[in-house]
């Protein structure tokens, strides 16, 4: 009876969808005491992470081939019909997610949405508008800004904060996003964390930044592949979110595992819904941004006149596998 009551109380608090990876931090904090042992990332954990990303890269390369469907929705007409009817579809990448690796967990989820009457340009405007992330993805993203930007590659910063029942979790994160263009109406991006640091005692007089790869091990790495295609009177978005975290103690898995899966699904759903809402409000061709008086395509505002995706939004160069990106940045 006590066990069932505990699960009900926990599920009541976390029934509200929360944005992206920060949710796993708050979930684990509920079960780890404030005196929990520091969990530094181990070499074998990173090796398992790199191997997993290599497999994700192989799947990505398959979808670049004309012999394979670019979107998962292309494999099932009923699936695509649900998206066009306004559903947001979210599901784990495999049956046993999160996947256990040496001293860690890999969380891997797919999410799909179709946004009618929105072009690929509008979606890119939202995704490259990093200064607006704190508005688009609130309340979890409390600060965001661009660090550097080029034609097809951006580095940006986010501060993620989430309050659990017993603690406030804060993660100070740098990301790198690379955009790739596949014709006028199709493209994809690869995003990965290049630095994740916990802010211990966030919001108190004792707040301090922990070194990278040190701390509670709630989130060690984050990575995503996002595909876009404009057709059928709108734009399809398909994202694969992959996160590496500390393992859950065996004695607590019966509590935490189902909650992590349920809330992970909700957080990806919320993320796609927020992108959809923001894309619907993006400046249309010929309209102007109220902030700077011009339309914008990314971190640097430019005048948008053609109805096709501008050449400065995606790279037309050679595709670099995610594993190569990660080895260079780690």
Feature locations, PLM:
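Extracellular/cell-surface secretome signature
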Residues: 290-330
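N-terminal secretory signal peptides that target proteins for export/translocation
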Residues: 1-19
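Eukaryotic helix-grip
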Residues: 39-289
């Amino acid at each position: 009876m006590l066990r069932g009551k505990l699960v009900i109380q926990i599920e009541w608090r976390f029934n509200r969808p929360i944005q992206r990876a920060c949710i796993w931090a708050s979930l684990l904090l509920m079960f780890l005491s404030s005196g929990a042992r520091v969990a530094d990332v181990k070499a074998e954990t990173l090796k398992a992470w790199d191997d997993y990303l290599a497999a994700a890269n192989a799947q990505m390369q398959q979808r670049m081939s004309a012999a394979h469907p670019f979107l998962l929705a292309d494999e099932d007409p009923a699936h695509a019909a649900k998206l066009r009817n306004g559903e947001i579809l979210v599901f784990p990448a495999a049956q046993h997610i999160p996947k256990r690796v040496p001293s860690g967990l890999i969380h891997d989820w797919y999410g799909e949405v179709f946004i009618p009457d929105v072009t690929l340009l509008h979606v890119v405007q939202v995704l490259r508008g990093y200064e607006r992330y704190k508005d688009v993805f609130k309340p979890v993203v409390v600060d965001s800004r661009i660090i550097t930007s080029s034609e097809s590659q951006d580095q940006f910063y986010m501060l993620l904060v989430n309050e659990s029942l017993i603690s406030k979790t804060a993660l100070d994160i740098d990301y790198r996003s690379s955009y790739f263009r596949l014709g006028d109406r199709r493209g994809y991006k690869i995003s990965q964390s290049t630095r994740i640091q916990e802010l211990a005692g966030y919001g108190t007089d004792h707040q301090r930044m922990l070194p990278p790869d040190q701390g509670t091990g709630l989130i060690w790495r984050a990575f995503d592949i996002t595909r876009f295609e404009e057709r059928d009177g709108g734009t399809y978005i398909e994202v694969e979110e992959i996160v590496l975290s500390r393992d859950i103690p065996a004695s607590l898995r019966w509590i935490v595992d189902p909650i992590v899966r349920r809330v992970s699904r909700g957080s990806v759903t919320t993320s796609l819904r927020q992108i959809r809402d923001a894309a619907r409000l993006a400046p249309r061709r010929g309209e102007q941004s109220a902030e700077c008086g011009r339309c914008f395509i990314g971190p640097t505002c430019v005048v948008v006149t053609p109805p096709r995706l501008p050449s400065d939004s995606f790279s037309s160069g050679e595709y670099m596998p995610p594993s190569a990106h990660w080895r260079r940045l780690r």
